[in-house]
């Protein structure tokens, strides 16, 4: 729970025994995402796929969670699918897709130099406060 920034569960009246309503409606979107990540980490897998798993998190929680995940997933491959540049900023390799086609491959710095699509997204998000 701690790695996934999900200690809010312990503050629930029933703690870890708190029932999850159909569709998780008794938790916020960010809380549901953190619970899903905590469940995934319980398996100690060789591969983790996080498909837009950080989108409902505020930037501070997103950064703290990604930092904590580094230690927890150091012996595994991690694939993060994201629209928010800050979520993938420090990835070893970023694949940029446009209309289902790969239009860029590299690190953030490399893509800022070589990939117009990536650069446009990054600049747009920086202007928007992300």
Regions found by a protein language model. Name each.
Residues 55-57:
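ABC ATPase nucleotide-binding domain "signature" loop
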């Amino acid at each position: 729970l701690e790695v996934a920034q999900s200690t809010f569960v312990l503050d629930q009246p029933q703690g870890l025994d708190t029932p999850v309503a159909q569709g998780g409606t008794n938790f916020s979107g960010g809380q549901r995402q953190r619970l899903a990540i905590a469940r995934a980490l319980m398996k100690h897998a060789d591969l983790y796929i996080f498909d837009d798993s950080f989108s409902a998190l505020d930037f501070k929680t997103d950064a703290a969670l990604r930092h904590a995940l580094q230690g927890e997933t150091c012996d595994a491959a991690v694939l993060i699918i994201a629209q928010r540049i800050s979520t993938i900023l420090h990835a070893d390799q970023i694949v940029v897709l446009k209309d289902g086609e790969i239009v860029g491959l590299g690190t953030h710095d490399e893509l800022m130099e070589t990939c117009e699509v990536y650069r446009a997204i990054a600049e747009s998000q920086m202007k928007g406060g992300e």
